[in-house]
Amino acid sequence: MDDLESEFNLKVVLVSFKQCLNEKEEVLLEYYLAGWRGLVRFLNSLGTIFSFISKDVVTKLQIMDQLRSGPQQEHYSSLQAMVAYEVGNQLVDLERRSRHPDSGCRTVLRLHRALRWLQLFLEGVRTSPEDARTSVLCTDSYNASLATYHPWIIRRAVTVAFCALPTRKVFLESMNVGSSEQAVEMLNEALPFIERVYNISQKLYAEHALLDLP
């Protein structure tokens, strides 16, 4: 996990999510998790604003690394294989978190929800005018996604923290792919891949009634 401290570059995230789907449209966990490592570097580059999310994501990545290197690692090559294995062997807590608190299905679900927030936020930044306030874009995206799963006190603290976000221009330049215009071009290329991965994951979880795991 040492690479989480290295400098963020949007292109690394793009490459990972491009490689995330195979010809069967299975979500390959190696590249999914690599994409998330890139996104963690992005969150960290913005300072402490997103630390509440990035710290949780790092914990989830560590859990998945353990599963993918453990005795049942052959079942954790893709999201589809993982779901089939864990659901088929009753390794998922469907009603309350008890026997299997750190199942792969629950762990990836948390990453999946956070990915939706980032996808919406970056899409908002991509399509917004130059004078748009990133704090408003981020808050709107959060309210449409992650806020549903957080208690009021966290929602309040988070929306206050978002007010410290930089201007749209500075935010785009922090992606380290050149000018703000070049960053928008890179988002144009990257976001469809992230959205496709999200949609396939969402459908898979819905088919197995896993979207509301405790």
From Swiss-Prot:
Cellular component terms per the entry's GO annotation: cytosol; endosome membrane; Golgi apparatus; nuclear outer membrane; plasma membrane
Membrane topology, as annotated: Peripheral membrane protein
GO molecular function, one term: ceramide 1-phosphate binding
Xref: InterPro entries: GLTP_sf, Glycolipid_transfer_prot_dom
Keywords: Cell membrane, Cytoplasm, Endosome, Golgi apparatus, Lipid transport, Lipid-binding, Membrane, Nucleus, Transport
Reactions it catalyzes: N-(hexadecanoyl)-sphing-4-enine-1-phosphate(in) = N-(hexadecanoyl)-sphing-4-enine-1-phosphate(out); N-(9Z-octadecenoyl)-sphing-4-enine-1-phosphate(in) = N-(9Z-octadecenoyl)-sphing-4-enine-1-phosphate(out)
Superkingdom classification of source: Eukaryota
A UniProt-annotated Pfam family: GLTP
Family affiliation: Belongs to the GLTP family.
Function summary: Mediates the intracellular transfer of ceramide-1-phosphate (C1P) between organelle membranes and the cell membrane. Required for normal structure of the Golgi stacks. Can bind phosphoceramides with a variety of aliphatic chains, but has a preference for lipids with saturated C16:0 or monounsaturated C18:1 aliphatic chains, and is inefficient with phosphoceramides containing lignoceryl (C24:0). Plays a role in the regulation of the cellular levels of ceramide-1-phosphate, and thereby contributes to the regulation of phospholipase PLA2G4A activity and the release of arachidonic acid.
Name of the protein described by the UniProt record: Ceramide-1-phosphate transfer protein
Organism, scientific name: Bos taurus
